[in-house]
Amino acid sequence: MNILLAWELGGNWGHVSRDLPVLCRLQSGGHNVLYAVRDVTISSPLSASVGIQCIASPMGAAISRMPRNLAGYAEILFADGLGDVAILRERITGWQHLFTEHQIDVVVSDYAPSALLAALVAKIPSVAFGSGFEIPPDVALLPSFCVGGAQDESARRFSEGLIVYNVNRVMKQLGGAPLQQMAQIYQGTHCVLATFAELDHITDRPSGALYAGPVQELPGSMAASWRTTNKPRVLVYLRGMGLLIDEVLRVLGGIGAEVIAVLPDAGSIRYVHADVRMFRQQVCFDGLLDSADLVIASGAGSITLSLLAGVPVLLCSACSEHEMMASRVEEMGAGIAVRAEMVVADAMHHVLHDDSFRDAAVNFAAKYAGFSQKTAIATVIDVINKASSGHS
């Protein structure tokens, strides 16, 4: 079977660390796999290291960096160019050319709506594997990313209507069936959520969703270990938050913590002390989480792995996606989100010294004690096999 895994939206290591384990398992099972990615710079060397063929996804015209704090799914698609019919058509036909060239039997989407539209036109079975944020629910109006989302309902209806209008213009040109609503981009797609229900970004997803759990394993991750036993052990993984990173490290220095900080794109760091080790590349969390006292992070993958190890989280949000995840963790009682009006030192002290946060994380870990990433990967592969055979 020829399988294309398409990554179109989002960035950084989280997508690659979720995609490559699935691709490797498929390839070892005798399938031909192709990885079409948004970011070749990150993905190509990592894919090559495990023998996976990697190419650039069809991006159409040049797209600027995704704005932060968008209000809804339609705004994401507009920002990525789907508000322009020419770009959308170029994107979809680009995917179709790949399908034909490589005789693709199944398309697997990692946050790749244009690839799913192309699969609809080509009548190729499709599977979506991703976080709750990346796989929207099948509802008439997709959820708002904002607190009090009812206030922007009319604007979201208008934006989604424009996206559907543009999509349908292209679908008509290419011989595809029209959409009635934006969620139908996923119509006929077998969806597998790389999370748990408690950590789904969507709080009111319709029943029947398939939760496989997280997959996060990056080849070439550096090994690290704790050096002390008499200090708080804190694991930090943050991107693009220069001022906040400085403040976090300053506070950690003040409490005498041992810190392993993964800061891939941080610039010059002002507050560094002897017990801080900084890494620009990914670090293997195995062996660190078991004896960590706190994790400071923003991404869904790192947060979920921390909670599976029973470690509470200080949540630092840089976008709506992070905010939605932070709210779920706070509802669970396993962490605190640092917001503009908060003092980092107070929030950190609260999580470290109030046992209720660790208790909530430990309870979550106990509930999913039987979980393994191998099982999650097996679930995805089972769905891919069923999709290819035409089963529901």
Task: Show which residues each predicted segment covers.
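A short, glycine/small-residue-rich beta-strand->loop->alpha-helix junction that serves as a flexible
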Residues: W7-L20, M241-G242
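Donor-nucleotide binding loops and adjacent catalytic segments primarily
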Residues: L23, D200-D293
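Conserved nucleotide-sugar phosphate-binding/catalytic loop shared by glycosyltransferases and other
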Residues: S28-G29, V33-D84
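Conserved nucleotide-sugar donor-binding subdomain of glycosyltransferases
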Residues: N69-V108, A112-S114, A155-Q181
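Conserved nucleotide-sugar donor-interacting segment of glycosyltransferase catalytic cores
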Residues: R89-S154
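A donor-sugar binding/catalytic signature common to diverse glycosyltransferases
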Residues: V106-D110, P136, Q281-A326
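Active-site-proximal region of nucleotide-activated glycan assembly enzymes
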Residues: P125-G208
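C-terminal amphipathic helix plus adjacent low-complexity
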Residues: A183-I185, A345-S392
